[in-house]
Amino acid sequence: GANWDDFVAFTVELGLEGVEGLSGIPGTVGASVVQNIGAYGQEVATSVESVEVWDRDTKTTRDLTPADLRFGYRYSALKTSMYAGPGRPAGRFFPTPRYVVLSVTFALTHSAEGTVGYGQLAKALGVEVGDRMATADIRKAVLAVRAAKGMLEDPTRYALPDMATAKREANILTDLERLASLNEAAGIPVGDDGLPAPDYNRHSCGSFFMNPILTADQAAALPEDAPKFDATLPD
């Protein structure tokens, strides 16, 4: 499938708002809707209009709406189709979903500005949560924050045979130059060619942790300064 960050970069170049906060996440557009990826105040679910899939059970194509997909916190109906029940793999399709994602239709806003929706990102930009900023600046800040935490994908991995054609060549070069600049600013040496050395700790397929989900009573028992976020759970 299409490289996710290639897609995000393309939307920012076109002056579209909606997924700029999801910059730098490894993986594909198809996988993004299976996991309902989210970061820095945005989730894929808020921008998806429909998903075209191949149903491996009925051998037909289907167009799934957000209601069909039942998006939740790192959750979708596509993801749960791998299971016959809680903790019970569906023998026929596991460890892959019943549905193969063929295409995703996004509904984005024609705007060169986006909303800063996360505290850490707002701090990096020197603004308040809820402020409007250029989507290009939001993307740049997200990538810098990820790099500082060691969570920015190593673009040198695309030189490996198994990764060939997985990302646009022009974007690989842009990513290499960006990471070299960020490394240099952080005092991390770059190669004689001015590009970053391979960092195998950044050969990532993304993070799979989830924040704990608590009842309102359980959350009330936490210290007052413990971060808390409302969660929308699937039925």
Where are these regions (language model features)?
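Anion-binding (especially nucleotide phosphate/pyrophosphate-binding) glycine-rich loop
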Residues: G1-T58, R62, D68
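Phosphate/pyrophosphate- and phosphate-bearing ligand-binding catalytic cores of soluble enzymes
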Residues: T61-D235
